[in-house]
Amino acid sequence: MADHNPDGDPTPRTLLRRVLDTADPRTPRRPRSARAGAQRALLETASSRRLSGQTKTIAKGRSRGARSIGRSAHVQARGHLEEQTPRTLLKNILLTAPESSILMPESVVKPVPAPQVVQPSRRESSRGSLELQLPELEPSTTLAPGLLAPGRRKQRLRLSMFQQGVDQGLPLSQEPQGNADASSLTSSLNLTFATPLQPQSVQRPGLARRPPARRAVDVGAFLRDLRDTSLAPPNIVLEDTQPFSQPTVGSPNVYHSLPCTPHTGAEDAEQAAGRRTQSSGPGLQNNSPGKPAQFLAGEAEEVDAFALGFLSTSSGVSGEDEVEPLHNGVEEAEKKMKEEGVSVSEMEATGAQGPSRAEEPEGHTQVTEAEGSQGTAEAEGPGASSGDEDASSRAASPELASSTPESLQARRHHQFPEPAPPPGAAVLSSEPAEPLLVRCPPRSRTTGPRPRQDPHKAGLSHYVKLFSFFAKMPMERKALEMVEKCLDKYFQHLCDDLEVFAAHAGRKTVKPEDLELLMRRQGLVTDQVSLHVLVERHLPLEYRQLLIPCAYSGNSVFPAQ
């Protein structure tokens, strides 16, 4: 058909022309149709040929009107067969193939648009369309083959989409999704792995920080709060150290919510006695700052007088009204004793350097007697005798000693040891305080060796339970003797057998292996049931410890080696 130069470049066109020159110009017969005709000739007989001739004549008479349609269909089928021959396929390839060399491809290949050829099926038409579209998606020859993997291709496409969104200054969610063209593909493959800087225009709501909520300053509210705090009394502002808000002037005070008890004459007497003790206490401190023992004695007398006056004033009140003043008076006495104890500790710190502790004990007792008589006279009032004062002071002193805290009394006795007063001294200093409740130490338990139970007795009870279990009925205590005899007889037979076995084998000592061999001959020990299994199953704990070494605490193994 065409001249072919053997020295020229082996292009697809030249190769196809050689194939066409050497191929048979006739359309080859299909082997399937040939096989079908041969089978049909073998199966035909005389009767079948006669019937087929009749059917053919009938079919010809009926199909005369449709011969034109059949002829056109036959022509189309014939053309259809001609299109499927290798010659027609190669002609179509020659029409669409470019004139280029296989060994030296050109840099840019632009396919020539071929005329549309009617394809016989959809599959072949799709193949032809793919052949036409493949040269458009050819990547550059400088790319590595490993970068064309499908998984990595998706990643590069994502990078290209991100780069395109950054270049356009649009958020990634608004970018249209679709297949990228060849230019975006090559640009994504040529990207470096450095992370690009994110511009201000790209909004990432997941990573953006929440703006701080700043409230505008309300000048009116600030001035109102300032006015409320300025109108509040200073003592409430200083005393209120709780973590909640300060009480304003218009708000109800916390202290008014507490129940207030009506004032009685007994409470007035308490307040008066408290004022007298407070006024007399600082005077004593100013007069004799270097005499702590004298100060303590006078203080005790004042508290005694206060308690005596309180009892005398509250004697005419009813039972319920009498309990509350007593409780309040005891609480006030405790508070005063604590405050005076703090002042005493300060006095000790200031006056410990001077030699004031070497005073005579007689002077101390005289001062305490004088001050005690003055305090009792003020609290009792005119018309009371000295004997009544002594009796009332003796009655009130135990209550006062019990009301004062024990830790404060111990600290005072430890700091200021009072000298021994003469027999005519004050009653409070001579009477001892109530003894404190001292807990007895727990008795130390003797940690001796625990008494071990006799394994023989424990074994007998175990065997009794075992016998009753296998007998499936309870057993009386009288049967225990018979069980014990059976056990003795069994162990006696076992020992005799061991002795005979040892004498026959020439052994001087019997080992566990010998016993296991004997019990294996008797049928008690088998491959499935070993000697240890029998011991664990049938012997009590005491015997098991003797036969099988058991580890105990203290790194000691029983039995000891």
Curated annotation (Swiss-Prot):
Spans of biased composition, class Basic and acidic residues? Answer: 18-27, 329-341
Q: What is stated as this protein's family in its record?
A: Belongs to the CENP-T/CNN1 family.
Q: Which residues carry this modification: Phosphothreonine?
A: T85
Regions that span the bilayer = none
Residues bearing Phosphoserine? Answer: S47, S343, S345, S356, S373, S385, S386, S397
Q: Which GO terms describe its molecular function?
A: DNA binding; protein heterodimerization activity
- Report whether ATP-binding shows up as a keyword of the record: no
Assembly state and interactors?
Component of the CENPA-CAD complex, composed of CENPI, CENPK, CENPL, CENPO, CENPP, CENPQ, CENPR and CENPS. The CENPA-CAD complex is probably recruited on centromeres by the CENPA-NAC complex, at least composed of CENPA, CENPC, CENPH, CENPM, CENPN, CENPT and CENPU. Identified in a centromeric complex containing histones H2A, H2B, H3 and H4, and at least CENPA, CENPB, CENPC, CENPT, CENPN, HJURP, SUPT16H, SSRP1 and RSF1. Interacts (via N-terminus) with the NDC80 complex.
Q: Which UniProt keywords apply?
A: Cell cycle, Cell division, Centromere, Chromosome, DNA-binding, Kinetochore, Mitosis, Nucleus, Phosphoprotein
Per the record, where are the segments of Polar residues compositional bias?
45-57, 276-289, 365-376
Biased-composition ranges for Low complexity?
Answer: 439-450
- GO terms classed as biological process: cell division; chromosome organization; chromosome segregation; kinetochore assembly; mitotic cell cycle
Name of this protein: Centromere protein T
Species this chain originates from: Macaca fascicularis
Its subcellular locations are: Nucleus; Chromosome, Centromere; Chromosome, Centromere, Kinetochore
InterPro entries, alphabetized = CENP-T, CENP-T/H4_C, CENP-T_N, Histone-fold
Q: Which Pfam families match?
A: CENP-T_C, CENP-T_N
